[in-house]
UniProtKB/Swiss-Prot annotation:
Belongs to the RNase PH family. It is an enzyme of class 2 (transferase). Its EC number is 2.7.7.56. Phosphorolytic 3'-5' exoribonuclease that plays an important role in tRNA 3'-end maturation. Removes nucleotide residues following the 3'-CCA terminus of tRNAs; can also add nucleotides to the ends of RNA molecules by using nucleoside diphosphates as substrates, but this may not be physiologically important. Probably plays a role in initiation of 16S rRNA degradation (leading to ribosome degradation) during starvation. One of its GO terms (biological process) is rRNA processing. Pfam families: RNase_PH, RNase_PH_C. It comes from Bordetella pertussis (strain Tohama I / ATCC BAA-589 / NCTC 13251). This is Ribonuclease PH. It comes from the Bacteria. The gene is rph.
Length: 246
């Protein structure tokens, strides 16, 4: 993918079309959770914690396998204007439910739940500050928090084998001003003609592709270009995950 001056200067951030936002993972961010990570993707900041619960949902009792699930939420002032807490409204929005199910599915895709035993790994992803890509940052950070929780279980002797089979990470891609771009911030996300969230494993397999035309359509060729950008971006994110765990 070209990184010419034209490619760079036309993005609000000045990034090349194939460039991620500045990205970091800060492990051990909170004291009590078995795993905790503050993930920063540009101005999107998400706190991901992993809690080990010595129980499983009723549908898994007695089956000798575990469960990985997730919850997602945004602080009231994570965005430009204050939003009410969903607890105060008495119910979760459809968006929240969709995102937390996506996070759970993405993590379960790389777990051998039989090796986890009859326990639950509960991931909480709380958006401290949102500037686009919160669900993708949540998945990428939650995997590191989960890895730390599993490492603690193995250190304690509660697990004989590591149930994590592969890494998993996610990134957004989209069409902005007729071009495919990687890792959209809020300004780009608000103006894009297509928005695609891509979840992949460290070995390069797809877990999920969520793509939507935003008042427009996109071609197979444009989708292929966006997926190519996503593959490159996720490879970088997986490297960052593995480096953070060293």
């Amino acid at each position: 993918m070209s990184t010419s001056a034209a490619d760079t200067l036309s993005r609000p951030s000045g990034r090349a079309v194939d460039a991620l936002r500045p990205f970091s993972l800060e492990r051990g961010f909170t004291r009590y959770a078995e795993g905790s990570v503050l993930v920063r993707a540009g101005n999107t900041h998400v706190l991901c914690t992993a809690s080990v619960l010595e129980k499983v949902p009723p549908f898994l009792k007695g089956r000798g396998e575990g469960w990985v699930t997730a919850e997602y939420g945004m602080l009231p002032r994570a965005t430009h204007t204050r939003g009410d807490r969903e607890a105060a409204r008495g119910k979760q929005s459809g968006r929240t439910q969709e995102i937390q199910r996506l996070i759970g599915r993405s993590l379960r895709a790389v777990f051998d739940l039989r090796l986890l035993g009859e326990r639950t790994l509960h991931l909480d992803c709380d958006v401290l500050q949102a500037d686009g890509g919160t669900r993708c940052a949540s998945i990428t950070g939650a995997w590191v928090a989960a890895a730390d929780a599993v490492a603690l279980l193995m250190q304690r002797g509660d697990l004989a084998h590591n149930p994590i089979r592969d890494a998993v990470a996610a990134v957004s891609v989209g069409l902005v001003d007729g071009r495919a771009v990687l890792d959209l911030d809020y300004q780009e996300d608000s103006a894009c003609a297509a928005d695609v969230n891509v979840v992949m494993t460290g070995s390069g397999a797809f877990v999920e592709v969520q793509g939507t035309g935003e008042g427009a359509t996109f071609t197979r060729g444009e989708l292929d270009t966006m997926l190519g950008l996503a593959e490159g971006g996720i490879a970088q994110l997986v490297r960052a995950q593995r480096e953070a765990l060293q």
